[in-house]
């Protein structure tokens, strides 16, 4: 990124060089001109004269009616750089031009057509008389004269034009070379050492070959620009070195038919190895070969040819003949130095400073009925005609002439690239012969034809020995007219009858009967006649440069079109864009193929080529097998970490990028790798960097081996602790003098395929290693299921579409909405008020529309359905394509709707706005529904990765999982598929299509099962310690398993129940890398049925004294026992016996000191542990079912109920994320060593569902529910409006009752309490010696508190409180209010 910024800054700096500064070059050029600088072919009246043809003028230019070739011409008085052109119709009229052609030149008798991108010479004009339409040209040309040729205008009016040109003055320093001269430029410091360079100049010539520029250095650096076959070649090298493996030479070609005597603009920008090569506005970007970044040039640079001793090095190259203008090298104008004869310039020969080549006067034949008729000298006995022509067409009429005295006619035609001569005379056999070969190559060819009595001669290009002479009895009398390029219509009027089509191309130097035709007189209609031609210009251009045919398709062109031949490319279509082969073996399987070799194209229409693979097609999947050159064991010795062995893997018929595209598009890939060693280590080193490793996709190094997982530097034996040395993680790391092997499958898709194997520890005398790699095997297509749902007015934004000349879009949609935009991308304006765009939308429920503007105005294709509507909530496939030849649209299997593109079309697909998926720009016309498998030019958009629920989108298509026909029971996860859904039961204790099949086992007396938790947890921690996306324990508020899954059916808690907001154990926390088990909580659920007691149903032991147990007591009741820390906890689960042989269910969840319990359909109860009880079940060890066979100290209460063991059925057992019965009955045999160690069963254990019935579509009625309790524990479940009304009624009655009680309480207790008054006593009562008064009332007695049910009663009553002191004298006369005691 830093290099890119520097490159842009340097380009901006060097672009300010003299003659190449574009900044501020936007002056209006027509307005300041004098009236004499504006001319025209004719004008309609004085008020429509050319001098009024200025923007925003009071009138405008209009030619006279009947002008066959109208034009408006501007003389800028000196050379200018033109960057934009603008047009306007005539003021206050119906006159405007809708299409026109732009010609430019340095002289009034030599014109060059300006071609837009796509070699289109036609500009869009106006749609009314007032609006100004401006075109910013894709490259800036230089000229003094500008000519506008109207091609179409308003049919309700006539031609009307006001013109504006934008640019700036231009200083031209011209060098003319005649093929024998050249100049050299000596560098200021004798050498040039540069990280960046800019070469820029203009040239014109009529020669096909010539050296334009050359410089070289002593270290092998050089840069050369030359013409070869009228193509411009750039040769560049930044040097080569014997120790560098890659050569530095790079050659790039640009353009075609550059010998057309038109100015061509060349620019080369280099920064390091990054190069931009520009020719006439077309930019090629490439990276130079080699490893160096500086260009080291010695002494001098040569222009136009070589000087002195330098000719010996490039003696086979021709010097340039023509004109070169403004040669710029790193802000130095070498042409200016040459004009000023600077001392650093050396001349070879006589270099002129103006163009001396004769100015050609060609005729451009470009119409369907074009021709030029010139008079001849009649009744001569010798017919002599010569001319020069150039064309791309295979056929065309070159010349037709009627012989005098009715003797017949002479016809020269172009057929299959050669000139055919036909002389027809009455009464004689027609004379026919041909000359030349491949004359339709776009170059000038000269034809000389002479016919006289009894013989005819034709020669092509004056090649000696190439003329064709024919002797035949002929009688020649010249006629009065010669028709070049075609016959006029109607032919009978002109007496020109030919079955050949009109010629399209250029002609010049026409000679009739030895006289050169004055084309100036012909143009002014003072000699002969013409139609649909342009004088003084040749509009030939190379439509195959750049090549519009993709994937190495061959381009063949005509005058106004091109054709692509796609044989042997693996593609088809108008531009070889559509893939011929399917993208995977899975696609061949779905089409009914059987196993065999097939050609696949994983990236579709993308740049990667198709290749051959072997398809192992089976009933349910198709394996794609890609073989390579390392299928046999490779022996390695003598390598070290400093100089390792690099074992590159060359896949058959495919490059690394192509195989990577296959893996990237596959659902699953695997590749077996095996390393055998003898005193050779593999991964373990002291510094951490391995001795050996493998390299995968994108040249990334990977330090894990087969059978292991990414991110951990281990082999397969390091995961299950089965390595030779337990302290190491690979067998080979033991470094023993005997053969060891580490092997296994590599299955992480994003790392495959293996491209190199690096071996680095075989340099000891006894060391040796061998490695072996099996073919890459893949199946599935993960791109086809990349699905998203749009719920509201939402849209996804992606980077703009990057398409050169073609675009194809395909996707599936499903909706019930009547309309919506699937995708839209807008671009910057290609002219003043037009913006390119592409849009695919559901316009109505029966119409899918593909709308676009790629430079030719608004277009759209529509697929209409008469038999059904597209918003039927079913999947429909949409495919839309557009290229320079045509646009087409298809929905499902309906026929393609086609729209041919106009000839000479450029597909303007330069988009600078984000690509909107799900709506139009600014979220207009949003789509509501599902989209999947959206591809643009072979690249699949990651729709799921952009889904955001807060913005109205979600991954997958929620049509099935939101309203499933059958939900996923017991916390199973609903997985959306193409036209169905599946249930993922991996994290449940059940299986079946809907996670509704109970998995249980019948325990005989003495049968027990142990599941080693610590072993399983250690294995899980090892396997997923470096994978963040794998669920690992954590916390989430208010969570019950499965409640976050669409279609979840509650289990024992009842519908809609959620636990309080406590942290839930076992929930994933992003980035958590600790132990897999959370000791602060458990989740236990299971079902059982039995008729015997006592028994231990479930027991969890630990490495300390902590445990958890669910047991059946002697009386048949259920009890839960916990030992957390030092304080035991006992809770009686039921008070009734459960040994009735009926199924019973238990669900226990502990979070810290909060315990939630539910048995059968009893209400959920919540218990809280005392603060004296620990909140952690420390160091869990094993899970026992049926009987406890634990070594060490066991709680005596557990021992009491442990004999003789459980006899009955247990099912659906789940402890956190462990389901031991499911693991035992559903794990394929043989088990892995680790799982076999963790799981142990003693006695007879047979599978049984314990009498459970699978879930049905609706809730099972109580009378049929096997889990239903006896009648003394009724359970009511009301639904519908009756339940709602009943609830409202009950609530109203309860509220009324509560209100009455409140009113009664307030009324009864409003005046409750005692109001005590101490009256004044008699005087004698205060006399000394009198008896003290008795207290009127004693202190209030505090009632003894009642003991709680679980608390022991107090041993003795609390002592009475001390009486309050008697009131003082001052308070004896005050009233005292004593509140009523609580006992009242």
UniProtKB/Swiss-Prot annotation:
Residues 1356-1368 have a biased composition (Pro residues). Residues 1319-1328 have a biased composition (Basic and acidic residues). It comes from Homo sapiens (Human). This is Contactin-associated protein 1. Residues 1319-1384 are annotated as: Disordered. The chain crosses the membrane at residues 1284-1304. A motif (SH3-binding) lies at residues 1328-1369. Keywords: Cell adhesion, Cell junction, Disease variant, Disulfide bond, EGF-like domain, Glycoprotein, Membrane, Neuropathy, Phosphoprotein, Repeat, SH3-binding, Signal, Transmembrane, Transmembrane helix. Glycans are attached at residues 120, 128, 276, 420, 499, 518, 597, 653, 664, 763, 804, 843, 860, 948, 956, 1078, 1147. GO terms for molecular function: SH3 domain binding; signaling receptor activity. Required, with CNTNAP2, for radial and longitudinal organization of myelinated axons. Plays a role in the formation of functional distinct domains critical for saltatory conduction of nerve impulses in myelinated nerve fibers. Demarcates the paranodal region of the axo-glial junction. In association with contactin involved in the signaling between axons and myelinating glial cells. PANTHER family: CONTACTIN-ASSOCIATED PROTEIN 1, PIKACHURIN-LIKE PROTEIN. Residues 20-1283 are extracellular.
